[in-house]
């Protein structure tokens, strides 16, 4: 992740969102990830999840909270959590005194740090852009788990398994969180530190919801795939006779 001065283009800082021992391998077999999601700025902090091509399937992912006000003192402007100081005979890293990391969520699960989703990793590869309001953050991983965290500390409030992959991002509006999945189900959660599923909207034609919903003028809009349709939901409205 790079931050530049908007007027001069000067590099302000850079932050490595992969562990130093992560490696790229074809077909998703590696541990290094890419950016598929969009960074979100909230309260002078940057939030970003990492993942891979969804065709690479699930795997270890990470979610970072970065201090965007950090003043980098190093010549290379590196504000990553650690710095590599040797590669031979083995990789050696040390804490970076310039680190802009506020908190990190993810990585492999361990006995001391068991996964809240019962997976072998704490947070999976993600294509999801975070949604944040009232210091409450929502993010999803490719494998279909929705996570709700404290945006300031990274502490977990709750998770929910949608039992289907999701390419979608949570959309927060009117104190509700909307997100779709590959089973064609649009989930509606209450914006809350407590898990409360307000509803599930089903499509029984084998379609997928991969785009992120959007709301305007009291209506919710979202796309489905295979077949491609645009759906519009309005409070109190009745579905058309043909379902379109």
Regions found by a protein language model. Give the residues of each.
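Noncatalytic, solvent-exposed loop/strand surfaces
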Residues: 1-244
């Amino acid at each position: 992740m790079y931050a530049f001065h908007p007027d001069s283009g000067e590099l302000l800082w850079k932050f490595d969102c992969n562990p130093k021992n992560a490696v790229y391998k074809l077909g998703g077999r590696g541990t290094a990830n890419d950016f598929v999601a969009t960074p979100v700025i909230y309260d002078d902090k940057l939030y970003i999840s990492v993942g891979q091509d969804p065709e690479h399937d699930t795997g270890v992912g990470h979610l970072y909270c970065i201090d965007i006000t950090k003043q980098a003192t190093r010549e290379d402007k590196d504000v990553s959590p650690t710095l590599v100081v040797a590669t031979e005979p083995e990789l050696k890293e040390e804490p970076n005194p310039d680190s802009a990391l506020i908190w990190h969520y993810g990585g492999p699960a361990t006995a001391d740090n068991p996964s809240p989703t019962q997976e072998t990793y704490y947070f999976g590869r993600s294509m999801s852009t975070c949604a944040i309001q009232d210091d409450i953050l929502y993010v999803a991983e490719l494998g279909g788990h929705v996570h709700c965290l404290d945006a300031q500390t990274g502490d977990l409030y709750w998770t929910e398994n949608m039992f289907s992959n999701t390419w979608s991002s949570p959309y927060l509006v009117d104190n509700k969180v909307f997100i779709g999945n590959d089973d064609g189900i649009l989930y509606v959660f209450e914006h809350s530190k407590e898990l409360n599923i307000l509803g599930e909207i089903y499509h029984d034609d084998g379609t997928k919801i991969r785009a992120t919903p959007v709301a305007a003028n009291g209506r919710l809009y979202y796309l489905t795939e295979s077949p491609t349709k645009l759906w519009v939901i309005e409070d109190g409205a009745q579905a058309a006779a043909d379902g379109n």
